């Protein structure tokens, strides 16, 4: 048996070798690094020590072990019905399809229901998403209709001559609801079966629900654990930043890029105390504990973990600026390793390298545990022990603990004892005090990117290191490195926007108004046509800039994955280099609220429009518009077109789930040729599945329209003061083929509009007329319109005008008025009488609107119109989004449930034909041209 000195020498050498592994580690190098880690344990083991290193990453260490692990993983995937997604991964678009299940709040009955139940509830930000309880005793009609119809089809086409015995065996082998599934196993199985973009969506929704996020995903089947860097790229958090001197302010940043001290909690051998419960208590302000980390006292929390041991989770504390809520003065990351550190040595080594302090929970410290920790002799991390020493090994614990004190450079203050009689609140305060002391001293601060760098050195796979992702990142950087000032970049590189586009849009509006005039002067019409052609020729004389050409190359990639990676990288890269500048000092953010009745100049918003992907697509649209206009006028032969393929590229992006701009937010005008060209290409790509229902939202700023749509359908509309769209964006949702006949459409086109001003009719002049036209256009295109309100008397005047204009045409979509309580989750919804008052605009406002639309004083209250009855679910009260105070607040369960009911009602109305006549894409094209 090797002496301790020799052991340490060997381990030190192994650690040095690992530290020299290149950041871009290859597969062979990764296997070498894993083998070195395994060799450390082989050198440490003595003949009298039965402990075996078992992280499942090295097949050579035990010929039987990987086989057992493989079968365990495969059994779990088979149990959950996910084995078919191991080659062709489950995609984000697959998970967002509208099906029979979208209309039913059904409970899972068999394990194969669990992944879909989790995804559906997570999409709706339901705090109960992690519950894997299955219901046995349910009525037959409580099962999803889609599954019933599938069973009926099987009965219809069943051949009695088929092998009955085989049918009996397959029936008897179906998993039963008695099979318990640990929620962490479900999460790991689903992540292993999902592509990178669905993994990213899962992480984003989990963050909104304040669930702990998977950081290292174990995969014993393929002998690689994966560090999930890409999966967390899209998570952005806002918190209160208070410098030592000066004024505090809110800061917004990606969790991947912002640096914070990290504290790891791990288990060694066995522990009577729950790490996850302790972490939840440490993270929760006041007496309300939020179950961020799933723990043993929750439903099914005691079920054995089959595949999730080795999972590393992460969560953060973010300060809010309120002394009564802020546990720590700065952001702090907390890491939790599932399983024993001896069985997951690579993960433990990673945690020791990235953490400022590691808390080790254990009941036993014997020779085996001593050897384990002795190998960390050179570590600079602080170590703390949380012991429960009442298992007959108290003396042994003390003996080895005393030997570890000089090895780990700790003292007796680093040893905490927690037994059943220990006061939990006092113990939590003590843990917080330790963390606070570490924060006040110089300590390591790391970002998730820094953690990924350390993971590569240890041989862990990083999800972001695939070739397609890195190629897309390189292309993004070639574009963004040239952006020093976003305003200057738009002026110099996106030349067709700005004044040329505004002038062309104004001329086209005037020309359109002449179309409706009784006797338009031909001379004026000819002059407008001449001016428009002149502007379009000026635009067509430009070539796309180098940045736009690089962007076009990125979205033209034949690889769908590379194209999607590129678009995501562009979103984050542009947000990083072109962060909007506040037009008011930071302290005003605390008191900012939308002014629904004032005369605020909407042309000068608090947040300037940030540079985004939509600006590059808008530039492509203007090249196409200018070229098409010249071809129509006979000024350019059709054979000389250079940009005819642009709408096809954009339609492919729409099919992948990217929101596309329908109405330009800066001019509030629609590039008709570009939009119709895009829809034509969409019709070609969808072939026979081109029946559409159009659902739009309109309303005042800051009422949560985009968040509502994102929660309801899993969409990606921009949210927040700094990035909310000012025009209108559209996104396509696919209806499952088995449900499209019943619903009456193949796709739902969802349109999210920017805010519409309210208040006096003449206060904003031409701007008001533009927004009234925008409301009329969106409501006129729609089968269903959701009108989002925040106060009981704030129906914008632009919407009143749109009602009056559409009533003349006879086109009345199905309207749903949504009143969102943005500030208080506990305020009850309006009573029926209040609902009717909600639809009665102020008398002077309604009379003025009627007079402007030449209807005299005959304007009726909205509640009196046939299409809007407050008693028939046309008016909805949505509780507040947050349960508690952000940034540590979770999404309210009441909000999630109310959104689900609204979604169910909308789909029922579409299904029952209450949403006016459904359209196909060609009809929508004609409607766009007409409106």
UniProtKB/Swiss-Prot annotation:
Record keywords, A-Z: Cell cycle, Cytoplasm, GTP-binding, Nucleotide-binding, Nucleus, Phosphoprotein
Tissue specificity: Strongly expressed in hepatitis B virus-infected liver and in HCC cells. Also highly expressed in well-differentiated gastric cancer tissues and various gastric cancer cell lines.
Molecular function per GO: GTP binding
The organism's place on the tree of life at top rank: Eukaryota
Chief localisation class: cytoplasm
Alphabetized InterPro entries for the sequence: G_VLIG_dom, GTP-bd, P-loop_NTPase
Pfam families noted in UniProt: URGCP
Protein name, as recorded: Up-regulator of cell proliferation
């Amino acid at each position: 048996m090797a002496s301790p000195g020799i052991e340490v020498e060997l381990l030190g050498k192994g650690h040095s070798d690992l530290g020299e592994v290149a950041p871009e580690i290859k597969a062979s190098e990764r296997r070498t690094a894993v083998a070195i880690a395994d060799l450390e344990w082989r050198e440490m083991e003595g003949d009298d020590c039965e402990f075996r290193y078992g992280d499942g990453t090295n097949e050579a260490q035990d010929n039987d072990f990987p086989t057992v692990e493989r079968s365990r993983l495969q059994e779990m995937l088979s149990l959950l019905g996910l084995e078919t997604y191991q080659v062709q991964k489950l995609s984000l678009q697959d998970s967002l399809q509208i099906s029979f299940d979208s209309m039913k709040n059904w409970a899972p009955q068999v394990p194969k229901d669990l992944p879909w139940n989790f995804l559906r509830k997570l999409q709706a930000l339901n705090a109960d998403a992690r519950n894997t309880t299955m219901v046995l005793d349910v009525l037959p009609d409580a099962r999803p209709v889609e599954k019933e119809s599938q069973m009926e089809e099987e009965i219809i086409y069943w051949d009695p001559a088929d092998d009955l015995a085989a049918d009996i065996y397959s029936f008897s082998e179906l998993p039963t609801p008695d099979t318990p599934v640990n929620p962490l196993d479900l999460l790991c199985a689903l992540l292993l079966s999902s592509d990178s973009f669905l993994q990213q969506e899962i992480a984003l929704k989990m963050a909104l629900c304040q669930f702990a996020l998977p950081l290292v995903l174990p995969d014993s089947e393929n002998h690689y654990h994966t560090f999930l860097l890409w999966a967390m790229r899209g998570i952005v958090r806002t918190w209160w930043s208070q410098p030592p001197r000066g004024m505090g302010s809110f800061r917004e940043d990606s969790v991947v890029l912002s640096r914070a001290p990290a504290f790891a909690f791990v288990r060694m051998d066995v522990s009577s105390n729950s790490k996850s419960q302790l972490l939840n208590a440490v993270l929760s302000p006041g007496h309300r504990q939020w179950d961020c980390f799933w723990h043993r006292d929750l439903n099914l929390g005691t079920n054995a973990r089959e595949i999730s041991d080795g999972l590393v989770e992460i969560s953060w504390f973010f300060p809010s600026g309120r002394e009564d809520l802020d546990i720590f003065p700065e952001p702090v990351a907390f890491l939790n390793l599932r399983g024993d550190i001896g069985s997951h040595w690579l993960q433990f080594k990673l945690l020791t390298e990235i953490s400022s302090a590691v808390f080790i929970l254990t009941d036993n410290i014997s020779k085996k545990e001593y050897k384990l920790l002795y190998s960390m002799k050179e570590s600079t991390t602080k170590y703390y022990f949380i012991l429960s020493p009442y298992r007959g090994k108290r003396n042994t614990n003390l003996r080895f603990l005393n030997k570890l004190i000089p090895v780990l450079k700790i003292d007796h203050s680093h040893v905490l004892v927690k037994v059943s009689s220990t006061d939990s609140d006092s113990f939590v305060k003590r843990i917080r005090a330790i963390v606070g002391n570490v924060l006040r001293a110089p300590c390591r601060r790391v970002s998730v990117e820094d953690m990924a760098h350390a993971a590569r050195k240890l041989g862990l796979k990083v999800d972001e290191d695939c070739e397609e992702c890195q190629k897309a990142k390189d292309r993004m950087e070639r574009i963004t490195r040239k952006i020093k000032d976003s305003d200057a970049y738009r002026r110099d590189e996106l030349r067709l926007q700005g004044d040329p586009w505004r002038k062309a849009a104004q001329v086209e509006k005037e020309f359109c108004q002449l179309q409706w005039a009784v006797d338009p002067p031909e001379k004026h019409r000819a002059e407008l046509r001449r001016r428009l052609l002149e502007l379009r020729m000026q635009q067509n004389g430009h070539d796309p800039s180098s940045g736009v050409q690089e962007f076009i190359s990125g979205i033209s990639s034949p690889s769908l994955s590379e194209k999607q990676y590129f678009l995501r990288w562009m979103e984050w890269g542009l947000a990083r280099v072109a962060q909007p500048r506040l037009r008011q000092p930071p302290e005003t953010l605390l008191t900012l609220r939308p002014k629904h009745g004032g005369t605020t100049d909407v042309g000068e918003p608090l947040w300037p429009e940030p540079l985004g992907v939509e600006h590059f697509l808008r530039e492509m649209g203007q090249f196409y518009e200018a070229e098409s206009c010249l071809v129509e006028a006979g000024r350019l032969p059709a054979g000389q077109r250079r940009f005819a393929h642009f709408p096809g590229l954009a339609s492919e992006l729409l099919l992948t789930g990217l929101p596309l701009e329908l109405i330009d937010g800066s001019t509030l005008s629609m590039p008709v040729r570009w939009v119709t060209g895009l829809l034509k290409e969409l019709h070609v790509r969808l072939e026979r599945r081109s029946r559409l229902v159009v659902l739009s939202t309109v309303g005042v700023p800051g009422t949560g329209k985009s968040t509502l749509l994102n929660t309801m359908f899993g969409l990606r509309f921009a949210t927040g003061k700094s990035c909310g769209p000012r025009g209108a964006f559209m996104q396509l949702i696919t209806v499952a083929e088995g449900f499209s006949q019943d619903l009456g459409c193949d796709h739902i086109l969802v349109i999210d509009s920017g805010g519409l001003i309210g208040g006096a009719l003449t206060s904003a002049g031409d701007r008001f007329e533009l927004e009234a036209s925008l409301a009329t256009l969106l409501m006129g295109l729609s089968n269903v319109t959701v009108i989002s309100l925040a106060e009981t008397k704030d129906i914008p005047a632009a919407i009143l005008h749109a009602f009056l204009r559409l009533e003349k045409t006879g086109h009345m979509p199905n309207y749903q008025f949504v009143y969102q309580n943005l500030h208080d989750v506990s305020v009850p919804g309006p009573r029926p009488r209040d609902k009717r008052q909600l639809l009665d605009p102020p008398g002077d406002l309604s009379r003025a609107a009627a007079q402007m639309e030449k209807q005299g004083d005959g304007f009726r209250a909205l509640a009196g119109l046939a299409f809007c009855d407050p008693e028939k679910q046309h008016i909805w009260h949505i509780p507040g989004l947050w349960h508690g105070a952000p940034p540590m607040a979770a999404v309210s369960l009441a909000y999630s449930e109310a959104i689900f009911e609204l979604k169910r009602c909308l789909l029922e109305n579409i299904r029952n034909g209450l949403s006016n006549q459904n359209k196909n894409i060609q009809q929508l094209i004609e409607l766009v041209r007409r409106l």
